[in-house]
């Protein structure tokens, strides 16, 4: 990442734990990116398009709240991002605004907040319905991994890849 002093505004997607993502215009400078994620930044490139994820590089070590999962092309959980992160566009070594298409794609991808549970050696992903209530089964239906609320209450857990 270059930090050549430019302070041009870029349009990014902000993804906070337990919240739906939102679009925000921020400075592309290092200090601005650090302020958004709450610390030292790390950039990763988990997608096939010209975009990047900026996250707090020390988020897990600092015990920041788990936020969203990163999944492989087959839908298996690969990693969990801790703390607030940004999705932004890339142009060579510089960061830039997301396109309208990218905004729509990543808004949909990260629309449903997630909680995570570690049980029996497996990380489980629990979608959080609108309003953040994970206690009741209302409005939850089936999770992406196939577990219903009734299954979870009965102790029938599912891993992120859908295996019981």
For the regions a protein language model found, what residue spans apply to each?
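Short, surface-exposed beta-strand/turn modules with glycine/proline-rich turns
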Residues: 1-32
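Short, surface-exposed polybasic-aromatic patches that bind anionic ligands, especially phosphate groups
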Residues: 41
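Catalytic phosphate/metal-binding cores of nucleic-acid and nucleotide-processing enzymes, i.e., regions
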Residues: 45
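Short, structured protein-protein interaction patches enriched in aromatics and acidic/basic residues
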Residues: 49-73
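Helix-rich interaction surfaces within compact, conserved domain-sized segments
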Residues: 77-89, 99
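Extended coiled-coil/helical scaffolds and adjacent low-complexity linkers that mediate multimerization
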Residues: 96-133, 137
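Non-Sec secretion/translocation targeting segments of pathogen effectors
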Residues: 135-164
């Amino acid at each position: 990442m270059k930090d050549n002093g430019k302070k041009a505004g870029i349009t990014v997607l902000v993804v906070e734990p337990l919240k739906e993502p939102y679009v925000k215009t921020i400075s592309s400078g290092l200090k601005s990116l650090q302020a958004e994620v709450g610390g030292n930044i790390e950039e990763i490139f988990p997608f096939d398009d010209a975009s990047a994820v900026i996250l707090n590089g020390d988020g897990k070590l600092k015990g920041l709240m788990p936020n969203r999962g990163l999944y492989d092309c087959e839908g298996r959980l690969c990693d969990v991002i801790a703390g607030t992160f940004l999705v932004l566009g890339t142009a060579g070594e510089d960061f830039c605004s997301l396109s309208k298409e990218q905004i729509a794609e990543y808004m949909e991808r990260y629309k449903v907040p997630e909680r995570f549970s570690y049980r029996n050696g497996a990380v489980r992903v629990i979608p959080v319905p609108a309003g953040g209530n994970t206690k009741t089964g209302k409005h939850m239906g089936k999770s992406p991994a196939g577990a219903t609320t009734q299954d979870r209450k009965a102790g029938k857990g599912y891993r992120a890849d859908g295996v019981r």
